[in-house]
Amino acid sequence: MRKDETMEAAAKPLSLKEWVSRGSRVLMGNVTREELVFRKGRGSWLYTTEGDGYLDFLGGVAIHVLGHCHPKVTVAVQKQAQRLLHTSNLYYHEPQILLAEFLVRETFADRVFFANSGTEVVEAAIKLARRFGAAAERFDLLGLEGSFHGRTLGALSLTGQKKIREGIGPIPEGFSWAPYNDFEGVVRKVSPRTAAIFVEPVLGEGGGDSGRSGLPEKTSDLHPGQGDSSCLRRDSDGDCPYGIAFCLSGL
């Protein structure tokens, strides 16, 4: 945007069509966007540049569990922004340690890895699983049909949706998929080269399926070879789906 256009936008309200037109010229078309331009959010409501209110059932793709601009969250962000915004992961800082201690205390975890996105977490889990299996030359990873793990190359390769993987050429080797509600099908796919099985305890994009066959529980106990592991990924349908902090805690 040129400087004069920026000043013009600040001085004169733009119409919805004008904002959409300008956005479509400069933003990548990696997703299909609705022709809505939001200016603010309060609680469960989003408000457009033209003042129309929309009840938000999407929640930032199921992450705004406290709603928009929750007063306590807003104050906490403001206070931290006045103290410290970023140091890198080469140092400790107080909120980082306090949050990690809380997560270890309240969940199944022994240690915490903080990341910027879900796909980054999956990439780290892929590397960890292969590192874990390296001594026995076990590098294969088994995903489940209908799953979604992210759009970076490793996470995309693990995703069990053909349409997501189309158009990018050959994916890295070592990835395969089994039906979600078929434990015997999972067992048939496991081989001596399997390093890990990736399971969404609640299949998000696959229809909110929580495993009618008890697949997540059974898979977490599956150890066909010495040192096999399961990677259980938190679903993207929001936390506390079963009234506990993480559905993984019940597995």
Kindly give the residue locations of the regions a language model identified.
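A glycine- and small-aliphatic-rich helix-loop capping segment at beta-alpha/alpha-beta transitions
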Residues: 130-135, 157-165, 214-215, 245-251
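Active-site-adjacent loop/helix segments that line or gate small-molecule/cofactor pockets in enzymes
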Residues: 2-42
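Active-site and channel-lining beta-strand-loop segments
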Residues: 35-58
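Surface-exposed amphipathic alpha-helices with a cationic face
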Residues: 130, 216-226
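Conserved PLP phosphate-binding loop immediately N-terminal to the Schiff-base lysine helix
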Residues: 200-213, 227-250
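Hydrophobic "anchor" residues on beta-strands that sit immediately upstream
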Residues: 52, 196, 228-230
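Glycine-rich loop-to-alpha-helix module at the N-terminal edge of alpha/beta enzyme cores
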Residues: 53-138, 142
